[in-house]
Amino acid sequence: MYDTNIQNNERIKKEIRSLNLTSDFFLSVALEDKAACEYVLRILMNSPDLKIKQVKTQYSIRQIGTHSVVLDILAEDSSHKIYEIEIQTGDKKGHIRRVRYITSSIDTSFLNKGNDYTQLPELHIFYITTFDIANANQTVYDIIRTDKIKSIEFDNGVHEHYINTVVDDESPIAALMNYFKNTDSNDTAHGVLSERVKYLKESEGGTSYMCEFIEKFREEGRSEGLREGLTRGMTQGITQGITQGRQLSKISTIRKMYIKNMNFNQISDVLDDDNEVKIIYDIIVNAPDKDDEW
């Protein structure tokens, strides 16, 4: 058992070292550090003096009866502007409308009842993809709302920035995206971000923290599954409900890990289970709609 635990721990450490910043799981852990997040946003905004007040990662917005949203990185600066960083590795349909839904969800959560619409904060969405979303050979697509005839700008305070990791225009943003792809812990070119990555990948404290983050992730999935199973147990019998809850917790955990861009090998190493994980993983991958919660 002792040898198995050591081997499992080494496998997890190896998986952590293989992660890069195009994994929203790893990006969330890296950028919950305020200095690292500030470094990234200063480059994305071309604003070297930008000051971040607070950062929240995996920020959940839930509304009864509607599609829930989990935001990868949500930050606020000293002038109360809001920034959201989203990572997408799957080249599937609906990205632009997904951004539309994200912005509306953020607006709903930040505008209190009775407040005027002018109190909506300035919002910048950075939608980072591992493919060129417009196939126009640009690193960045900055979107503005304009009148079709005279190109008059209608600024509603929402700024959409579509950025990809594949087109290298030799700009500072492209250099940052190259680092996102490679995320070599020996690359020191990106200051506090490089330091954060090295800490998480190489130090004992960093890898322990990553393991804690993974365990927290598993617990959230377990709690969600048990909650649903126990609710069903009200009508189907408590024992059966708890059994269903345990099964749902595993499904929920695997699904959350898949959404966070973890592959089968990474998930099975963390859960220490190949056979059942493989069955559930294949069902999730081939499901027609995998985005019940973002």
Name what the model sees in each region:
Residues 1-158, 169-171, 294:
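Accessory alpha/beta interaction modules
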Residues 2-17, 21, 25, 44, ...:
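Short, charged alpha-helical interaction segments and adjacent helix-coil junctions
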